[in-house]
Amino acid sequence: VRRVVRLLFCIFLVVTVVGGTVGYQLFTRTHDDPLREVDAIVVLGGEHDGREDYGIELARRGYADHVLISDPYRPYTEQDSMMPRVCSASTPDITVTCFEPHPSTTRGEAMFVQEMARRHDWREVIVVSWSYHLVRARFIFGQCFDGDVVMHAVPRDYSPNPVLWGAVYAYQYGGLGKAAVLGCD
């Protein structure tokens, strides 16, 4: 019994160290691409952490004249003023389109972007999300979107809590596995 417990502990330790080291490289280190002018800016769903305004700001800075904002938050609560505000932020120079992805996942967002790219003859997009989501989002967009993708993290700080990062790594690993199995069909 002790031998089995020791073996299981060693396996757990190796998996934790390897998973943490690889997770750090994949999900904690920056994987931003240099910004360049593209056909559209895509803001993926997630926390209201400034990503929506950041996507619109990138458009104002001239990187694109169309912003797609994923909007899986409907129906809105009375406290949620963010989405109604950003979804009505179009100007004469910038078109903001909010969309509800189906399915309500990164895959659904990438499939919608592919459809919009077909309609509008887009070849390049900037995708804005959390820094730790960029690797998985790049993988999924690579499956679902025929064009070039510039990945860029929303500028923000992240909690240094190792338990939180462990959960983030596990979620991202699971999401990568799911994406590898499901593909984009």
Predicted regions and their residues:
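N-terminal type II signal-anchor transmembrane helix
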Residues: 2-32
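Intrinsically disordered, low-complexity sequence elements enriched in Ser/Thr/Gly/Pro
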Residues: 1-4, 49, 136, 176
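A transmembrane-helix-recognition feature enriched in membrane-embedded lipid enzymes
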Residues: 161-185
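Membrane-interface helix-boundary signature
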Residues: 1-5, 161-164
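Structural signature of transmembrane alpha-helix termini at the membrane-water interface
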Residues: 21-25, 55, 177-184
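A structural signal for short, hydrophobic/glycine-enriched beta-strand patches
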Residues: 24-169
